[in-house]
Amino acid sequence: MGLGRRAMVYLGLAEEDEDYLDDDYDDGRAVGRDDRRAMHEPVPMDRTVRRIDAREEPVAMPRRPPVEPLRPAGPVPMRRVAAVEESHPYRITTLQPRSYNEARQIGEEFRDGTPVIMNLTDMDDADAKRLVDFAAGLIFGLRGDLEKVTNKVFLLSPHNVEVTETDKRRIREGGFYNQS
């Protein structure tokens, strides 16, 4: 019997051919149709039914001590990592790249923990898009933040530095220059 035929029989789409049942395993004795059924008839099981009296006590399961958690449930307070407050001065680097080749400088400044203003106004649109994609990957990899300040001007903030609203407003107004 072929593979397709066996699959159809298995799925119940075709009847099993009785000619093929024992062809491969001929042991010399003739087996009739009734003998095959007798070989596969289910054996009746002896089942006894016992009624349970309502007066009988259920079997008690052994009690286990209550489970105690290893650590307390609920949120664990964590402090922010080196968050910069308004009283602490920080410097923001402004970079105005002219080609995609200057992406390395942006990455190094950002990696060192310095917020970077990326001014892409002097770049063509294709290179500017590549640089924004680079910055997005940089932000994702180092868990920073990317904000669009104006058209083609972006602020990249490291995860441990929070740029104040005052500084963001000054950047939008265009009066924020390199503070090195």
Curated annotation (Swiss-Prot):
Upper classification of the organism: Bacteria, Bacillati, Actinomycetota, Actinomycetes, Frankiales
Function: Cell division protein that is part of the divisome complex and is recruited early to the Z-ring. Probably stimulates Z-ring formation, perhaps through the cross-linking of FtsZ protofilaments. Its function overlaps with FtsA.
Family matches, as HAMAP family: SepF
Family: Belongs to the SepF family.
Keyword terms: Cell cycle, Cell division, Cytoplasm, Septation
Assembly mode: Homodimer. Interacts with FtsZ.
Cross-referenced Gene3D superfamilies: SepF-like protein
One term under GO cellular component: cytoplasm
Extent of Basic and acidic residues compositional bias: 27-40
Subcellular location: Cytoplasm
Keyword Signal: no
Record GO biological process: division septum assembly; FtsZ-dependent cytokinesis
Region Disordered, residue ranges: 21-40
The name this protein goes by in its record: Cell division protein SepF
A Pfam short name: SepF
